[in-house]
Amino acid sequence: DKKIYALRDVTGTVQSIPLIASSIMSKKLATGSNCILLDVKCGNGAFMKDINEAKKLGKLMIEIGKKLNRKIAVEITNMQQPLGKTIGNKIEVLEAIDTLNGHGPKDFTEIIYSSGSTLLVLAQKAKDEVEARKMIDEVINNKKAYNKFLEWISRQGGNIKVFEKDSKWFNPQYKQEIIASQSGYLKIKSRIDFGLVAMKLGAGRSKKEDSIDYEAGIYLNKSSNEYVNKGDVLFTMYSSKPINPELQKELLSAIEFSESKHDIQTVFAKLM
């Protein structure tokens, strides 16, 4: 797959939907799973920018699965806005833990329930989405979901004590708050700009040889569509190194304020 991708890179076929589908499905089919759920991200922060192109890709991957007797479901989800309230590495793990304990952000929690219920129905563990969502409720409320997460970490030799309440596991040396200069409903115009700022903080790589700063990231104190008062903290940036003041300008240029809310869909479409 890596060799084929290198060829696509130099032949102008990176955007080829049949080649994208074969790249994704070759890896998914190799897992041996009979039921596979694919989350196709769509929007300015995703590889697939157009909903119709995303649907075309989804349908093609379902057809590939059918030819090999696999049950495939595809969800097309929104990447116009950041999902949840965190962007980074450790900071996203902590958000996942909050969600497993029933305290996650509304949009991220909805993705969990939507994807989980789709897969439970696909695998015939639940008769419909209503029953499936009740099953997810149960394992979150009785802590089975969180305890399974701890078991995964432990069985791979990880230290689960880092997730205890008094742990200093997430301990960035530098932080910078970004303050609202006006009031109104927050709108994030470009999710990709938030990803680029997180990368510049150290949460991602711009070159293969770059190292990752696991403390680096962004916390969204305010989310898209939330009403903000002038002087409120909008976002908090974290890093293990001094934070470039220019990054604040980059985030502020990626947002705007309006007098009314705007429509946001978490899941655009489901294909089965």
UniProtKB/Swiss-Prot annotation:
Gene Ontology process terms (BP): pyrimidine nucleobase metabolic process; pyrimidine nucleoside metabolic process
UniProt organism field: Metamycoplasma hominis (Mycoplasma hominis)
Descriptive protein name: Thymidine phosphorylase
Keyword Glycosyltransferase: yes
Keyword Isomerase: no
Organism domain of life: Bacteria
Protein purpose: The enzymes which catalyze the reversible phosphorolysis of pyrimidine nucleosides are involved in the degradation of these compounds and in their utilization as carbon and energy sources, or in the rescue of pyrimidine bases for nucleotide synthesis.
InterPro entries: Glycosyl_Trfase_fam3, Nuc_phospho_transferase, PYNP-like_C_sf, PYNP_C, Thymidine/pyrmidine_PPase
Alphabetical list of PANTHER family matching this protein: THYMIDINE PHOSPHORYLASE
Catalysed reaction equations from the record: thymidine + phosphate = 2-deoxy-alpha-D-ribose 1-phosphate + thymine
Name of the gene encoding the protein in the UniProt record: deoA
Lineage: Bacteria, Bacillati, Mycoplasmatota, Mycoplasmoidales, Metamycoplasmataceae
The EC number(s) this enzyme carries: 2.4.2.4
SUPFAM superfamilies: Nucleoside phosphorylase/phosphoribosyltransferase catalytic domain, Pyrimidine nucleoside phosphorylase C-terminal domain
An example Gene Ontology molecular-function term: thymidine phosphorylase activity
Family: Belongs to the thymidine/pyrimidine-nucleoside phosphorylase family.
